[in-house]
Amino acid sequence: MQETSEEPIEKLPDLDSSLFEKFLPDKIGLEPDADIYMNFMKAHECYDAIPTSSKLVVFDTTLQVKKAFLAMVANGVRAAPLWNNKEQRFVGMLTITDFINILHRFYTSPMVQIYELENHRIETWREIYLQGSFKKLVSISPNDSLFDAVYSLIQNKIHRLPVIDPVSGNVLYILTHKRILKYFHLFASKLPKPSFMKKTLQELGIGTYKDVALIEETSSVYEALGVFVARRVSALPVVNNLGKVVNLYSRFDAINLAAQQAYNNLDVSIMDSLQQRWHCFENVLKCYAHETLEVIIERLVEHEVLMPASIPERQWATRERADPGFVECKWTSREEGNESMK
């Protein structure tokens, strides 16, 4: 386990200016809108987006589930590759999704200890959760293109993609949507800007405009976990009795239950749980349906977030019917596939 924190990319690497020439419209015979960003991604390898220093935690499948999640919290990571010593290979990923699934599946009441969390090993949970349907870990080579990485993330509906050296078999990094977006943003100003970057979220159809997944502040943590499991979203807007967004409850808040040893009582309200939030949290980052994609990407990169952003342009009239001005932007694919154990 490497203990140093991830080093941010602060400046453009020294690149030959000819790198960008082949992306100019007159060179490729297309309008700036056509495939500019795709071609850029195809020209860069996953290795290019790997920071010079990062933190990586790897778990053996014989480790107890509880210890694994506590280690994730202590090291500030949201996922870890799983190593099977018998097979001598990486077999999956342990993520916050697994913690949520365990709590939601086995929790009964504050009076009953969650035996499965306290005593099960990772390999036991994998057998219960996957029920024998083990799939090969989705990974990528450092020499593969960023386009391949993006395609794999979308195609497999995962949030994290292990970059594995094909020679040594070592995991070099966990590539995410956030990291790729941050890397791409560094070069965006050097490329012709497609017209869709000037279009609004509404025009592009980005976001969820109906049946937005949310949770009331008086609802229990267990109910929130149920929504995470059913809807497979990254975060839930928290609303008061007037339907106004007052906070955000994320999957990372759920993993913090392990740090606080609070997972044995999931009947507490979301409001009370958020008051115990130990990590720094600013106001809910918002965006609006009338804002352009360019503006939103700038905001996401600036604030270093990549999760649903609540967009209340007007307060809701009732809790049952969401106001058309409210949008939930999902900037990442839904968490399924090998995002959870596979």
Where are each of the predicted segments found?
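Tandem CBS (Cystathionine beta-synthase) repeat/Bateman regulatory domains
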Residues: 1-342
